[in-house]
């Protein structure tokens, strides 16, 4: 958000104490700035190792169908390898969770609360639904992926990606003295690469089907999960370029969140690495005082030069 107690003007990049502050500098305008700097440098030599296609697309943060998805479906996403710069520089990401948004609407019958026995309370009817979801949540979140988690999450004790089931919104009733005739629960399901989106939806549907509550269940599938072979030559090439450009050999990990890049990777089959300019526990993306280390920004430009130069 641009509102709030920013220490700097959010719509202008400002350098302070070795960091650059501004809205979106980490996620992910900083990566774009570094790319432009790298391309300027490469233009001086006139040689690159690859024929480049650069896609700067919109709407990744909202909805489940971004500009990258649109271009993919048009057949415009082509190539032998892809580098997605929407990430952190802690690790090279080769996997991510998928996301499904769900909505369960429990129906009842309204009445005056003084004679509530004449109605059917949809909020109270939703309690068994929530209990069934919480039971399924425990089962779902006991699973683990073979894809390692990020360095930041590993330091917190989470060694690999895990699926998630969340109830994040509830809406029911219009007034205290009216029996509610509707209660809507909303949430999401994070799908690890070993799961399928279809199976995850079927599992949730099966958990709620035995309940007596009159209910409508809807799914809104978003970005799919992604997994790239860690032994692919492109993965090694990216890691080695990071070592030359930024001075460290990065570990491989997965993103606990979801990426529109996964849609393009799934549809095209093009091997993909995700590597950006921010740091997961420092950059405060989507928050006040979003920032990136100046040294990381310059190092990322050097990484791109190392990756692309002939």
Model-derived regions, located:
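Acidic, glycine-rich active-site loops and adjacent beta-strand->loop/helix elements
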Residues: 19, 55-63, 68, 85-89, ...
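Active-site alpha-helical elements of protease catalytic centers
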Residues: 24-39
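Short helix-loop-beta-strand segments that form the rim/entrance of peptidase-like active sites
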Residues: 39-60
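Structural helix-boundary/capping segments
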Residues: 53, 60, 103, 120-136, ...
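Midchain, well-structured core segments that form catalytic/ion-binding scaffolds
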Residues: 69, 73-213, 223
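Short, low-order "capping/linker" segments at domain edges
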Residues: 227-242
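Zn-dependent metallopeptidase/amidohydrolase metal-coordination segment
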Residues: 241, 246-308
């Amino acid at each position: 958000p641009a509102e709030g107690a920013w220490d700097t003007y959010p719509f202008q990049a400002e350098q302070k104490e070795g960091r650059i502050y501004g809205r979106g500098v980490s996620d992910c305008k900083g990566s774009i700035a570094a790319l432009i700097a790298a391309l300027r440098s490469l233009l001086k030599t006139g040689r690159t190792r690859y024929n480049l296609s650069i896609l700067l697309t919109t709407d990744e943060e909202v909805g489940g169908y971004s500009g990258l998805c649109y271009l993919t479906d048009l057949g415009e996403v082509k190539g032998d390898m892809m580098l997605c710069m929407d990430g952190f520089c802690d690790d090279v990401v080769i996997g991510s969770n998928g996301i499904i948004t769900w909505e369960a609407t429990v129906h009842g019958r309204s009445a005056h609360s003084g004679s509530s026995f004449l109605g059917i309370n949809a909020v109270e009817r939703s309690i068994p639904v929530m209990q069934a979801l919480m039971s399924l949540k425990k089962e779902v979140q006991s699973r683990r992926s073979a894809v390692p988690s990020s360095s930041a999450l590993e330091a917190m004790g989470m060694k690999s990606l895990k699926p998630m089931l969340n109830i994040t919104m509830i809406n029911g009733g219009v007034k205290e003295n009216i029996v509610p005739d509707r209660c809507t629960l909303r949430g999401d399901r994070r799908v690890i690469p070993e799961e399928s989106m279809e199976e995850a939806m079927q599992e949730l549907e099966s958990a709620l089907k035995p309940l007596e509550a009159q209910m409508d269940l809807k799914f809104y599938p978003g970005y799919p999960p992604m997994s790239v072979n860690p032994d692919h030559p492109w993965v090694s090439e990216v890691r080695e370029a990071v070592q030359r450009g930024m001075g460290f050999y990065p570990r491989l990990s997965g993103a606990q969140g979801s990426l529109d890049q996964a849609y393009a990777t799934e549809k095209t089959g093009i091997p993909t690495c995700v590597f950006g300019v921010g740091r997961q526990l420092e950059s405060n993306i989507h928050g006040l005082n979003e920032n990136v280390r100046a040294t990381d920004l310059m190092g990322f430009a050097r990484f791109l030069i190392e990756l692309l130069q002939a």
